[in-house]
Every structure is written in C-alpha cells, then in structure tokens.
C-alpha cells in the first residue's frame, strides 16, 4: 500500500491540519530502495523517524493502520521525541505477526524468488482474485479500486518486485517482534487513540482493547461496517475521531 490509503481521511479532516502521508517501501512504492537498505520492521521504523527528522516536524500526531500501526508501536517504544500523540488504527499487534490468513500467505510468497513472486502476483490483476480472503478480501470492503492501483508497481517493475521480496523476508523474520514491542508500550506517556474495526477478520478486535488497556493515556473507539483498512472503508468516521482527538 502507499500514501493514497489516507486520501479520503485527509480530504475529510477539518481545515487547519498539516497532513504529511509518506509512502514507505511496502511494495506499492515507485522508486527502488538501495541494495543495502534495511527493510526489516525496525529498519522501516528508523526510516519513518528519519522522515520526521528531515522535515523537522514536532508535536506530530502519528497515525498508523495495518503494518503502519506496527511501525508506530516500534517508534513508541523508542521514545519518539517528535511525536505528541499516536493513533493506532486496526493494526498488527502482539502475536498476530504475520497477521491473519492474509499475512501468512504473504510471508510464504516472500520465500519465492523475485521472478516467481512476480508471476504469482500477476493473478492480482483480476478483481475476483484480489477479493479473496488471502488477498485484500478481508482487508477492505470498499477499496478494490485503490488496492488495484497499489498492485501496479509490483506488477510492472522488476526492481519493486525485488524490494517486495526483501521486505517480506525481512519483516517476517522476527515473529515475536510485536510481543516485545508491546512490553514497552506502558512506558509511552503521551495520549493515544486506538481505533478498531469491530468486524475486523485480520486484526482481532480483542487486540484493540488490549492495546487501549496497555497504553496509560489511551482510549478505544470501535468502527462498524469496516474491515482492517478503515481509511478506505470509513474515511469520514476516521477523520472525525482523529480530528476530535488531535484537537
């Protein structure tokens, strides 16, 4: 996925917010990473921290959904000096890594050579296959057009396929990383909002409740009629609760 995940949310936020939505190298990026780039989950967290540094952002409301929420949790454990508050939106947590059926299939595809991986991913050109539970079917109810666009770089660019395989191998190499990250969350002393899809079939709703209980200054909001990718399924509701939280 890329930054377009947040288009609907950003468009629905009240005026006055400066919104910056980076595209991390999660297989929908258009420019290949350097061969020595660290594409593990901690490496992606450091990349995001560097992004905040380079833009010299302060008192950031950092929002993460799906894998983005896992990256935010790692930053929370590291202190995240530039972050004033966080929003965790239906995301990987605790022992749900790789997440659900979708994540487990992705982890297996990451074991393929890039050429074979590319041939396998060609199936995602077809909407009925994208809508399967092992693809995007359990991640979003309404976002098929967006997910089809996300697939273009990995379908068209060999260098992005190589990055995708590297990312999948690196991020899923450590199956307990989010269990350890959760142990550090009680030390996060800034406000947190946990937003979870009540119908989520990939990220257990019980994990949303656990995160809200674990983080000292956190509250939980549940969103109906949505799967994991709430920014696609319910952008208006998510924008409203983020706006209320960020003040």
Q: For each predicted feature, which ranges?
A:
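Catalytic histidine-centered segment of alpha/beta-hydrolase-like enzymes
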Residues: 226-235, 239
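C-terminal alpha-helix
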Residues: 241-247
């Amino acid at each position: 996925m890329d930054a377009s995940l947040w288009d609907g949310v950003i468009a629905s936020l009240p005026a006055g917010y400066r919104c910056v939505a980076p595209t991390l190298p999660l297989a929908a990026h258009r420019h290949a990473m350097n061969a020595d780039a660290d594409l593990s989950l901690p490496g992606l967290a450091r990349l995001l921290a560097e992004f905040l540094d380079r833009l010299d952002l302060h008192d950031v409301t950092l929002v993460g959904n799906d894998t983005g929420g896992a990256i935010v949790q790692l930053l929370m454990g590291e202190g995240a000096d530039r972050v004033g508050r966080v929003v965790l939106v239906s995301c990987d947590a605790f022992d749900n890594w790789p997440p659900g059926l979708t994540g487990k299939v992705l982890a297996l595809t990451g074991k393929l050579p890039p050429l074979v991986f590319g041939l396998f991913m060609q199936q995602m050109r077809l909407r009925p296959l994208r809508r399967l539970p092992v693809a995007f079917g359990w991640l979003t109810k309404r976002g098929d057009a967006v997910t089809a666009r996300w697939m273009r770089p990995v379908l068209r660019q060999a260098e992005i396929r190589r990055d995708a395989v590297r990312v999948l191998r690196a991020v899923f190499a450590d199956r307990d990383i989010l269990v350890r990250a959760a142990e550090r969350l009680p030390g996060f002393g800034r406000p947190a909002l946990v937003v979870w899809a009540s119908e989520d079939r990939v990220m257990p709703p019980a994990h949303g409740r656990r995160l809200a209980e674990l983080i000292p200054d956190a509250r939980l909001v549940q969103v109906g009629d949505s799967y994991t990718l709430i920014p696609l399924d319910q952008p208006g509701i998510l924008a409203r609760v983020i706006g209320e939280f960020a003040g």
